A protein has these predicted regions:
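Low-complexity, acidic Ser/Thr/Pro-rich "mucin-like" tracts of secreted and single-pass surface proteins
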Residues: 110, 168-215
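Short Pro-Gly-centered beta-turn/loop motif in secreted/extracellular proteins
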Residues: 126-146
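Residue-level recognition of well-ordered beta-strand positions that form the cores
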Residues: 58-60, 75, 151-153, 182
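Short, low-hydrophobicity acidic/polar segments
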Residues: 1-70, 114-126, 136, 172-173, ...
């Protein structure tokens, strides 16, 4: 039968389209990671795994930040990011979307939910929560130790940070990644990255990074 999707190419039950999108429990997909068959007890035990990865992005201001600012836009960039792809739910293998003939569904993702967002207090933060298509991040061509770029428009001025690839090397299915940015003026002053098993583990021992403001 045809999978219930607008894509008419999917006539195979095991191949499902995926979209990077705002987190919604109803949009999650699962696949059988492994199964055990017990012939004596006549049962099959299946172990399901999240097909998607998940990214939570927090943006706030430093305690000493004196002014109000607006988060106008947020974008993620890496050559290996997927906006659309397909997954074989029998194996968990992610593949290129059949309509992605010119890489039009790869390379970046613009976050739109809740934007623009006014930051008028250190107690407030903008948060984006995304279902991400699993992928191995590629090193930045100019800074090979870094991978995922986060570009934030702060009150009309762009600022960017590139996360060290040793700390965030991929978006793995079934894992949640938390990236927290702190603003000082129109620069991203600090970044922390945490990964969880949807079981938190602090990356880089919680040390903030010094990102590159974008001129």
């Amino acid at each position: 039968g045809t999978v219930g999707t607008a894509d008419t190419l999917y006539n195979v039950r095991t191949t499902i389209p995926m979209d990077t999108q705002d987190y919604d429990p109803s949009k999650e997909l699962y696949y059988v990671a492994n199964q055990e068959v017990d012939a004596k007890r006549y049962f099959v035990e299946m172990h399901f795994k999240h097909a998607y990865s998940r990214l939570v992005l927090n943006i706030g201001v430093e305690d000493a930040y004196p002014a109000t600012c607006s988060i106008n836009s947020v974008a993620l960039a890496n050559d290996s990011l997927f906006r659309k792809a397909v997954i074989d739910i029998t194996s968990g293998t992610v593949g290129i979307h059949p309509d992605d003939t010119e890489k039009q569904f790869r390379g970046g993702y613009n976050i739109t939910k809740g934007l623009p967002y006014l930051l008028d207090s250190p107690d407030k933060k903008y948060q984006a929560d995304l279902l991400m298509i699993p992928t191995k991040l590629l090193p930045d061509p100019f800074e090979p130790t870094k991978g995922l770029s986060v570009i934030v428009n702060v009150s009309g001025f762009p600022a960017t940070v590139i996360i060290p690839i040793d700390d965030l090397s991929d978006f793995e299915s079934g894992k949640k990644y938390v990236v927290s940015l702190k603003l000082r003026g129109i620069a991203i002053k600090s970044v922390t990255v945490t990964t969880t098993d949807w079981d938190e583990k602090i990356l880089n021992e919680g040390v903030d990074y010094e990102p590159l403001p974008q001129s």
